[in-house]
Design a protein with these regions (language model features):
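A non-catalytic, amphipathic alpha-helix used as a structural packing/dimerization or gating element
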Residues: 13-24, 104-111, 115, 141, ...
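Short, contiguous alpha-helical
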Residues: 32-87, 121-169, 213-218, 222-223, ...
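Functional-site microenvironments in short loops/helix caps that host divalent-cation chemistry
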Residues: 135, 139-141, 145, 149, ...
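Core segments of cupin and vicinal oxygen chelate
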Residues: 224-228
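Active-site rim elements
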Residues: 5-11, 96-106, 129-132, 207-209, ...
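N-terminal regions that are enriched for targeting/export leaders
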Residues: 2-32
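Short, helix-capping/interhelical loops that line the mouth of catalytic, cofactor-
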Residues: 1-10, 60-113, 155-166, 261-266
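Short glycine/proline-rich turn/loop motifs
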Residues: 2-4, 89-99, 122-123, 199-205, ...
């Protein structure tokens, strides 16, 4: 469905679903959890739910004549980096603020939800519909951020509102796929919503390359660790080795050594590392070092995208690895799957790409060698 074709009901339903998902993520938190900031790179839960409401209010102010803000004082705290709306509060100090209170933020969330519902229940022009669609996608982005902040904040103490079982993987044989190079159109050219950083679509030349069909597993990463991967500087970029020594890295974040085995504390609980799950919570430097140890390399953004989206038989790029059908629970492990841990490598047969690559979306974010210059 294009933006031009999107109905009022579709926009309203998407908005309601998104707001409900945000509330579900914090449903089982204690009041004391909402304001805690455990690291400079994360934000307190109350900031996230306030910030997504603030962005919706910015859209309201841009589209509604004589709009009156709920509270001018909230803006500085809830602004992230939009200097045109005032000086943002220092991100590293979001957790030192006891005001606004959790109750004030939750009230703000409810008020803005109702204000947006009232506006988008009526006919909208194209520009207004686009801005509210952008706000929905922005909130989905912060749901991802909220989840990884909850991992850092609570780990195995977090209780999701709903949990489903992970599918059983019947495919454990990792292969290398050869992909022919040539000119490739990187970026987006469709009519659905996209971020400006996905534009414009442009041609890029690729050499022939090979890519694994599965993400790197915990078992594979353990081999790197057991063979001294964190002790041998020759595998590491210079900045990466500095980080290893400064931070005393010896494993992925959230891994702990318990006598003779590695365990983790995640949304499932305190548990032994599942060797069939994709390795996660590793930095770019760790991913790069692993690849050098394994005599491989990380793909570029364009190489990754072609392996994920290019249908070589039809000569077209698809919206998703499996085609243009919207994601379902049979395609990928996404937030709405409510699984709350990674699925085993080789899961989601229906979600593999035309080249045969699995889990190209869902489960984990994947590193590339391409620098983000947006």
């Amino acid at each position: 469905m294009t933006l031009e074709q999107q109905s009022q009901n579709s926009l309203l339903n998407s908005f309601n679903e998104t707001r409900n998902t945000t509330l579900q993520l914090v449903k089982n938190l204690e009041r004391d959890d909402f304001g805690v900031q455990t690291a400079v790179f994360m934000s307190p839960p109350k900031w996230h739910i306030g910030h997504v409401s603030w962005l919706n209010e910015i859209v309201l102010s841009k589209t509604q004549q004589d709009y009156k803000f709920f509270s001018e004082e909230l803006s500085e705290y809830l602004n992230s980096y939009y200097n045109q709306f005032g000086k943002p509060h220092d991100k590293s100090k979001r957790g030192v603020m006891s005001r606004p209170t959790v109750d004030e933020i939750l009230e703000y969330f409810e008020v803005i939800t109702n204000r947006v519902r009232e506006v988008i229940s009526k006919p909208l022009d194209k520009e207004t519909m686009y801005l509210f669609t952008m706000a929905i996608h922005h909130e989905c982005q912060h749901q991802e951020l909220l989840v990884y902040d909850l991992q850092h904040l609570l780990g195995d103490q977090y209780r999701p509102a709903k949990r489903n079982e992970s599918p059983i993987s019947l495919n454990k044989e990792k292969k290398k796929i050869r992909i022919n190079g040539g000119l490739y159109n990187l970026g987006y050219s469709g009519k659905d919503y996209c971020y400006d950083i996905e534009l414009p679509e442009h041609k890029i030349y690729l050499n022939d390359y090979q890519i694994d069909t599965f993400p790197v597993s915990n078992a594979e990463y353990l081999e790197f660790m057991n063979e001294g991967g964190y002790d041998d500087y020759s595998f590491w970029l210079s900045d990466g080795w500095d980080a290893v020594e400064k931070n005393e890295w010896n494993s992925p974040m959230y891994w702990e050594k318990d006598e003779d085995q590695w365990i983790t504390r995640d949304f499932v609980g305190k548990r032994k590392i599942n060797q069939n799950e994709p390795v996660c919570h590793v930095s770019f430097y760790e991913a790069s070092a692993y690849c050098k140890w394994a005599n491989k390399r990380l793909p570029t953004e364009a190489e990754w995208e072609k392996a994920a989206l290019w249908n070589n038989e039809k000569g077209v790029k698809t919206d998703f690895p499996w085609g243009n059908e919207k994601p379902t629970e049979s395609h990928a492990n996404l937030l709405e799957s409510n699984i709350w841990n990674c699925s085993d490598i080789g899961s989601y047969e229906n979600g593999k790409s035309n080249y045969g690559c699995y889990q190209m979306i869902g489960d984990v974010w994947e590193w590339t060698t391409s620098e983000f210059v947006g």
